Structure formats: structure tokens, C-alpha cells
Amino acid sequence: MDNYTYSELLKSLQNKCDNIALIIKPEKIKQELERIEKEQEDPNFWQDVLKARDTNKEKVRLNRLLETYQKTKNSLDESTELFELAQNDNDEVTLSLLYEEAPVLEHSVQKVEIEIMLSGENDASNAIITIQPGAGGTESQDWASILYRMYLRWAERRGFKSEILDYQDGEEAGIKGVAFIIKGENAYGYLKNENGVHRLVRISPFDANAKRHTSFASVQISPELDDDIDIEIDEKDVRYDYYRASGAGGQHVNKTESAVRITHFPTGIVVQCQNDRSQHKNKASALKMLKSKLYELELEKQQSTAKNEEKSEIGWGHQIRSYVLAPYQQVKDARSNTAYSNVEAILDGDIDAILEGVLIAKA
């Protein structure tokens, strides 16, 4: 890096910071925080538990956003001032240090951008993830299990918790389907753009001739809804099926019909849960999944109407990302149009750069 390149980087980052300030309005955030603090001083504030909880969550979010912005702005201003002084004094040591810290400065501005993008209505929610293999039998079922592990490892890396709702083993390898919840701050906000088809190209470990195979799996993400969000489901619109939960190889792991499958006729959505030995708990979890999917579907319809466009089909034609393991190694996302070479790390859950790249591309 040289003086000109660093100078242009500072201008670009300052411009981004100015735009961020126009969006978040730091002074208004301070005023809102003062208002919330006064509201919390009222002895009657905590009588409405749900409202108090939501207000406190908003206070935490605003505080974090303001602190992140101010810290980044201060660092950027200090770097700009130091750069000007170092240039005037021909201080090569300081200039070299500034060049080394440039990626950190750039990342801090990007972090504020991400914070803004994770301020949607449901972004702070837990994420319900459903993975289904495409056509292709064992190949696609194995690919679905690889994706499942990738998201679990991502959750582990972030210190998030996960809970299985439904898990169906594949006949030879992999899985026929899985539904699970990732619980953590902004889990849905980060993962919401994972909706779509994920494509894998590799030398098949199941092919004796070691031929290259292409496999597909569908990922669907919906927010876990708070209990205070009311979604009406007409009983005549659904069918409940009860069956025995199955383990590996089709073995019955429960003698009672504790597993629950719900079919919603108007939308064609099917959800199922067999995680618990209690049919009642499985039914409650399946209903929660259905409500989350219906809520997500309605939001997508509203957004499509607002943009005056048709809702994009989340199906086998909606391919969002390719993972190529042979003849070369590369992961490419169709939304950010960015390619990544650290395929092994990505499949081990190192997907933050991809998730953030898509968030920025869709901003």
C-alpha cells in the first residue's frame, strides 16, 4: 500500500461513515435512549412484562449500535489525523503501521454497516432451519447432511445453541431431511439470506468409477416467533398425522405415535417434529414451525407487493450458492458474486464472510 491508496481508502471509509450517520442519526438515538431511561424509571413500567422486555431489547440494540458507530468514527478520525501528520513529517514508521491496520479499520466500518442491516423486525430472533435434499438419492442426502453440519459448526463458533426438531436418516448415508433451531442473538438476521438451493460439485465418494457428480439441497429459514405474535390457523385448513418416530435404519425409537406431521392445505406447507417422546410437545413444536413459515411467507408477499414484483420461488430453480470441490475448489455466492477458496473452512462453519457479503450486497 502507498500514500495514494491509503488516502483513497480513508476517503471511501469517511464517505461510508457519513452515509451511516445519515441513516442511524446518532443524536436521535441518544434522545431515544434518554426517553427509554426515563420511561424505565416509572414504577409502573415493569407491570407490562412483554412491553418492558421489548423496550429493554430495543435499548440494548440502540446502545450497541451507537457505541459501535462512535468507536469506528473515532478510530477513523484518529487515523486520518495521524496520516496527515505522518505525511507532513515523512514519518515512514507511522505510515507503515497505518497501512498494516487498514484492514482492521475497513472491517470496523463494515461491522457498523452489518449492525444497520441486522435491525429488521425479526433479525434478532432465533432461526428455524429446514434442509431438504434434492433429487439424486444418496448423493443429495449426503450433501444435505454436510450443509446441516456446516450450520451447526457456524452456531458453535458463535457460541449459539441448537435444538433438533425433526431428523430423518438417509437410507445409505446422509439425511432425508432435518429441521432445527439455532438460538442466538441475530441468528435469523444473519441466516435469513440462506433461503434457496445450494449446489455441490465433487468427485462422488459413492461412485466406484470416481466420477464427478452435482448434488442439490434446499435450505429454508424462518424466524422463531415470540409467543406474543399471534398467527391465526384455521383448524379446517390443516391435517395432523401421528406416527412413530424413527431412528437410523428405520428402527422405531418410540413405541407410541409421538411424531407429528402437520399439512397446511392453503399453502402446501408441511412440517413435522419427532424430537420429543411427548406427542403434545412435538405438536407444539410443529405448530411453532408452521406459524413461523406462514409468517415468513406473509412478509415475503408484503415485500414483493411493496416492490411491485412477484415473489421469487424458493425451489430448485432458485440457486444461491455453488460449492465446487472438483476439479478445483471454490465457493461462489450468486447474490454477492463473490468467490471464496477456503472451501474446507467454509464447510466447517466459517461462513461469516459469506453471510456478511450477502447482507451488504442486498443492502
Swiss-Prot record:
Gene that specifies this protein:
prfB
**Alphabetical keyword list:** Cytoplasm, Methylation, Protein biosynthesis
Instruction: List the InterPro entries.
Output: PCRF, Pep_chain_release_fac_I, Pep_chain_release_fac_I_sf, PrfB
Q: What does its PTM field state?
A: Methylated by PrmC. Methylation increases the termination efficiency of RF2.
Q: Name one GO molecular function term.
A: translation release factor activity, codon specific
* Originating organism: Helicobacter pylori (strain Shi470)
Entry's localization field: Cytoplasm
Which Pfam families does its entry note? PCRF, RF-1
Protein name per Swiss-Prot or TrEMBL: Peptide chain release factor 2
Lineage runs: Bacteria, Pseudomonadati, Campylobacterota, Epsilonproteobacteria, Campylobacterales
- Similarity comment text for this entry: Belongs to the prokaryotic/mitochondrial release factor family.
Residue numbers of N5-methylglutamine PTMs: Q251
Main location, first listed in the record = cytoplasm
